[in-house]
Curated annotation (Swiss-Prot):
Coiled coil location: 152-216
Protein name according to UniProt: Leucine-rich repeat-containing protein 59
Organismal lineage: Eukaryota, Metazoa, Chordata, Craniata, Vertebrata
SMART domains xrefs: LRR_TYP
Disulfide bonds: none
LRR repeats, residue ranges: 10-31, 40-62, 63-84, 86-107, 109-128
Length: 306
């Protein structure tokens, strides 16, 4: 087998206007670099070669308008084949293609397509039709584009669905993580509160013990004088109302004097004296008055009025 550069020869020598014919060149590789240097070659014929794949940089030949890849051994097209947005005519007759890349839907300029003699997927084969004449090949291009757009839309929906599933899964995971973090925060908060409460109780207990220790010496000092005082003889309580006692004693003394004078005036020889005569008269009147209860009634009346 021959490499692309050898039997391809000087590509400029094969260029006829805008057409470049590399058919029947026994190529097993596409000379992409040489082709990229010929942007005028908008019509490229690579039919009847031994190509099994197209390199990804082949899709950079966006100047291509007509491309003939018939009668090769292509099993698949590059994933970004849709970059050939100026392509209008595409011949894929007699290859080994089963499916087309989803990007095929981006070939909006495609007007003609031939997919005969390929082991196509049954659905794609039915869409493509027979391509027996010009009209059917044009219909094939239109129908395949519509089909690939539908496939692309389905894949996009599936991609969005998977993205949504992934987002939902991520949201659930994030919610689970937030719940876990909240639970951990709550646990730490509760532990901190319990630790604070424990320390507060210890502090209160320490203060209470300190207060008890401060009270004990006071009790001992209060009890010590009591014990000493119990051993000593009790002192008589101080006299109160000393002045009242003096007045009372004076009154008693006066009464004794009066009583003594009265006795002397009544019993002794002094009763004949003028002073004793007056005293005896007063005494007799007083006795008579008491007997008539006048003084007693006067006292009672005075008490009732008060």
């Amino acid at each position: 087998m021959t490499k692309a550069g050898s039997k391809g020869g000087n590509l400029r020598d094969k260029l006829d206007g805008n057409e470049l014919d590399l058919s029947l060149s026994d190529l097993n590789e596409v000379p992409v670099k040489e082709l990229a240097a010929l942007p005028k070659a908008t019509v490229l014929d690579l039919s009847c070669n031994k190509l099994t794949t197209l390199p990804s940089d082949f899709c950079g030949l966006t100047h291509l308008v007509k491309l003939d890849l018939s009668k090769n051994k292509l099993r698949q097209l590059p994933a970004d084949f849709g970059r050939l947005v100026n392509l209008q005519h595409l011949d894929l007759l007699n290859n080994r293609l089963v499916t087309l890349p989803v990007s095929f839907a981006q070939l909006k300029s495609l007007k003609w397509l031939d997919l005969k003699d390929n082991p196509l997927d049954p659905v794609l084969a039915k869409v493509a039709g027979d391509c027996l004449d010009e009209k059917q090949c044009k219909q094939c291009a239109n129908k395949v584009l519509q089909h690939m757009k539908a496939v692309q839309a389905d894949q996009e929906r599936e991609r969005q669905r998977r993205l949504e599933i992934d987002r939902e899964a991520e949201k659930k995971w994030e919610a689970k993580q937030r719940a876990k973090e909240a639970q951990e925060r709550e646990l730490r908060k509760r532990e901190k509160a319990e630790e604070k409460e424990r320390r507060r109780k210890e502090y209160d207990a320490l203060k209470a013990a300190k207060r008890e220790q401060e009270k004990k010496p006071k009790k001992e000092t209060n009890q010590a004088p009591k014990s000493k005082s119990s051993s000593r003889p009790r002192k008589p309580p101080p006299r109160k109302h000393t002045r009242s006692w003096a007045v009372l004693k004076l009154l008693l003394l006066l009464l004794l004097c009066v009583a003594g004078g009265l006795v002397a005036c009544r019993v002794t020889e002094l009763q004949q004296q003028p002073l004793c005569t007056s005293v005896n008269t007063i005494y007799d009147n007083a006795v008579r008055g008491l007997r008539s209860h006048d003084i007693l009634q006067w006292v009672l009346q005075t008490d009732s009025q008060q």
